[in-house]
Design a protein with these regions (language model features):
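HhH-family (HhH-GPD) DNA N-glycosylase catalytic core used in base-excision repair
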Residues: 1-249
Length: 249
């Protein structure tokens, strides 16, 4: 059951969102990388690669993503589509990043290469299969699993799919200094699902938006439904309020 929020909580969350959803937010955030490249297909590809390593230490994943951007020469979409990544991500068991070895990341990029070669862009792939965020997540998890990639993209939409939810926010929210909104014409922002980052979960409990700290897809959807009381038609504006405050604390 979705809790009814007091007006004071609604006002506080709206104020926090306005404070944190600024251009400054991208500094030290994985969303920064998609703003460093040009062209819709390239921004989309850069964003998808950036989300794939966006966990653990910010210093570490920002550095790893920068190395991938440098290797691509600023053209991530072509770099993947042409298979140039094999030169720096060989299929061996050496560590690539934290829990990922080279073989895992190579298979992830190879599956993405297949998608690009078959469909042109990820947006073109999803717009024929998705009308909301959940169906987009289901299509992506299914495609990567079916094409031999495991351990980076979740195998289904039962987990929180935190990074995919963040990626879909980037792609689907228009009119934002942070998010690009490239897919706003086929994924309505009202359908986006809250990325269940540890900061978001903690602040949600503090504000009484969640009763416990367990993170599942059903929990993420309940939190999103609650945020619709605060931001009608744009629940993930609340992501900036909760995440921004959590990082600041």
């Amino acid at each position: 059951m979705t809790p009814t929020l007091p007006q004071s909580t609604i006002d506080t969350l709206r104020s926090l969102a306005e404070r944190y959803e600024t251009r400054q937010f991208i500094q030290g955030d994985p969303s920064w990388f998609m703003h460093q490249v040009e062209g819709r297909a390239n921004q989309e590809a850069m964003a998808f690669v950036a989300q794939s390593v966006a966990y653990g230490s910010r210093k570490q994943f920002m550095a790893k993503t920068q190395r991938l951007l440098d290797a691509s020469g600023g053209d991530m979409s072509r770099w993947i589509a042409e298979g140039a990544f094999h030169d720096i991500v060989p299929r061996n068991s050496s560590c690539f990043y934290r829990l990922y070895n080279n073989d895992m990341f190579n298979r992830f990029l190879t599956a993405y290469q297949t998608l690009l070669r078959q469909h042109g862009t990820m947006g073109d792939f999803l717009c024929r299969r998705s009308s909301d965020a959940l169906s987009a997540i289901e299509a992506l998890t299914r495609f990567f699993a079916d094409n031999g990639s495991h351990g980076i993209i979740p195998i289904n939409a039962k987990s929180t799919c935190k990074r995919l939810c963040m990626f879909l926010r980037w792609m689907s929210r228009s009119g934002s200094p942070v998010d690009l909104g490239l897919w706003s014409h086929f994924i309505p922002r009202r359908t986006l699902i809250m990325p269940m980052d540890v900061h978001v979960v903690r602040q949600s409990v503090n504000f009484g938006l969640l009763k416990g700290s367990s993170a599942t897809m059903s929990t993420a959807r309940r939190l999103t439904d609650t945020m619709l009381q605060v931001f009608p038609d744009d629940p993930l504006k609340g992501d900036f309020a909760l995440f921004g405050l959590g990082v600041a604390d």
